[in-house]
Amino acid sequence: MSAVPHDSATHPPVVCLLGPTASGKTAAALALAADAPVEIISLDSALVYREMDIGTAKPTREELAAAPHHLIDIIDPADSYSAAQFVTDAERLIAQIRARGHVPLIVGGTMLYYKALTQGLNDLPQADAALRAELDQLAAERGWPALHAMLAEVDPVTAARLAPNDAQRIQRALEIHRLSGQPMSALLARQAEGRTFAGAADQRFRVIALEPSDRLALHARIAQRYDAMLANGFIEEVERLRRRGDLHPGLPSIRCVGYRQVWEYLDGDADFATMRERGIAATRQLCKRQLTWLRSTPERLVVDCLAPGYVDQVRRLADFGH
């Protein structure tokens, strides 16, 4: 799939407001909505799920009412949503928003979706439900670090960049190796060597990246936000999801940061303090991955998300008021 097409003669750049968790993306996006008839396209693999509001830090009703939002609450937690689906949806939405005379604004931190939209998708094997179930069962018996060790034997390059408990990525890398007989790292390297993205030359994005000047300060903000989620009913939200009876920790929805840790707590596998510590640590790890992806995006315009006037700087860079 190619990058989203764009006619630079008739349309300004698609502004993308990217940043790690807890970097203030929502506040900045709503400030931009005050400058222009903005419609926000969510770039967040967790916000797509219905019934998952607190642990995903979903925008409030008031925030959602301040500007049209898209790709939030679009699928059931029992279902999955892929980068390919995001590209299809985002391409359609960009065209529709522009046809209405409005301004598309892409906001979020799921960098895989951003890369797929702007650079195209790779041709790796499709997901195999039976194989994933087999790997989930193996992980339940032996633990994800054991599967990480298995991955290191067949694809050391990929294993070296994954944490031993990064279940979703370990599973995907093992799945690709089992289905193709080749390491995922080798497949991606070959595709990168020969890839030319149709539309990449004439597609213009203005990428504004919210990055912290002090990572420890962002870590403190992450801990405060996680504690606020717990105080606002996060555990009760996960309890409601468990009562449905059709959800389990192997699903992408329940693997979302925070949800897996609370699920384990409700299973009796951790006490409250351990659950809290693991949830905050997992969020920090997510933040680190997001920043790593962002810093590999040379076209980005960096804004210090901890600076008092960061919203005003975002507004100047987006240039919606002109």
From Swiss-Prot:
SUPFAM superfamilies xrefs: P-loop containing nucleoside triphosphate hydrolases
Q: Where is this region: Interaction with substrate tRNA?
A: 44-47, 168-172, 255-260
InterPro entries xref list: Dimethylallyltransferase, IPT, P-loop_NTPase
Its EC number is 2.5.1.75
The record's annotation in Pfam families points to: IPPT
- Gene Ontology MF: a single term: ATP binding
Residues at the site labelled Interaction with substrate tRNA: T110, R132
Give the reaction(s) catalysed: adenosine(37) in tRNA + dimethylallyl diphosphate = N(6)-dimethylallyladenosine(37) in tRNA + diphosphate
| Binding-site residues, substrate | T21, A22, S23, G24, K25, T26
GO terms under biological process: tRNA modification
Q: Which residues bind ATP?
A: G19, P20, T21, A22, S23, G24, K25, T26
The coenzyme or cofactor needed here is: Mg(2+)
Q: Sorted alphabetically, which keywords does the UniProt record give?
A: ATP-binding, Magnesium, Nucleotide-binding, Transferase, tRNA processing
Record family assignment = Belongs to the IPP transferase family.
Assembly:
Monomer.
**What does it do?**
Catalyzes the transfer of a dimethylallyl group onto the adenine at position 37 in tRNAs that read codons beginning with uridine, leading to the formation of N6-(dimethylallyl)adenosine (i(6)A).
PANTHER family reported for this sequence: TRNA DIMETHYLALLYLTRANSFERASE (PTHR11088:SF60)
Official protein name in the record: tRNA dimethylallyltransferase
Taxonomic source organism: Cupriavidus necator (strain ATCC 17699 / DSM 428 / KCTC 22496 / NCIMB 10442 / H16 / Stanier 337) (Ralstonia eutropha)
